[in-house]
């Protein structure tokens, strides 16, 4: 095996419930290498990171870290081995709907210089995915969608 290989992800698949979010994804990172994973909101970047961390079980595939198969190891073990990531920052109420999360700070203001409904439509025009998911709980959104909501 390559002595410089830090992490190897082989054909990983994971998701939530019956929904597969990450499907047959593979990559390798060598010591000192920087890897950027990009994609649109809801494409599985956060799910992939949570799978590598062991916060979500891999349905298929293998995760190797420093020549050790860690696919079935606990999140605690992975953390102690040196695997970690900084999650996306977001402050939302996970039990409120998207629309309730948007409207809450508007309705808590004493004086408004605008129509709450107009402000809501303005926000939806900037973030169409939020309008599409306006009745969904905040916790059901992807990490990127939660960040937009915040």
Residue ranges of predicted features:
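Short coil-to-helix "N-cap" segments within the ABC nucleotide-binding domain's helical subdomain
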Residues: 3, 108-125, 132-139
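The feature captures the beta-strand-to-loop junction immediately N-terminal to the Walker
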Residues: 38-40
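Helix-to-loop junction immediately C-terminal to a conserved catalytic motif
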Residues: 53
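Conserved ABC transporter NBD signature motif
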Residues: 61-69, 81, 114-120
């Amino acid at each position: 095996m390559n002595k410089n290989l830090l992490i190897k992800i082989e054909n990983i698949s994971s998701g939530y419930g019956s929904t597969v979010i990450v499907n047959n994804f593979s990559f390798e990172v060598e010591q000192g290498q920087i890897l950027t994973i990009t994609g649109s909101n809801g494409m599985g970047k956060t799910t992939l990171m949570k799978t590598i961390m062991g916060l979500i079980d891999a349905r298929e595939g293998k995760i190797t870290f420093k020549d050790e198969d860690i696919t079935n190891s606990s999140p605690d073990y992975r953390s102690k081995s040196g695997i970690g990531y900084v999650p996306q920052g977001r402050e939302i109420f996970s039990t409120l709907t998207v629309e309730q999360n948007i409207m809450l700070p508007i309705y808590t203001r004493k004086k408004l210089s605008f129509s709450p409904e107009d402000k809501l439509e303005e926000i939806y025009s900037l973030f169409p995915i939020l309008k599409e998911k306006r009745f969904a709980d905040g916790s059901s959104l992807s990490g990127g969608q939660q960040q937009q909501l915040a």
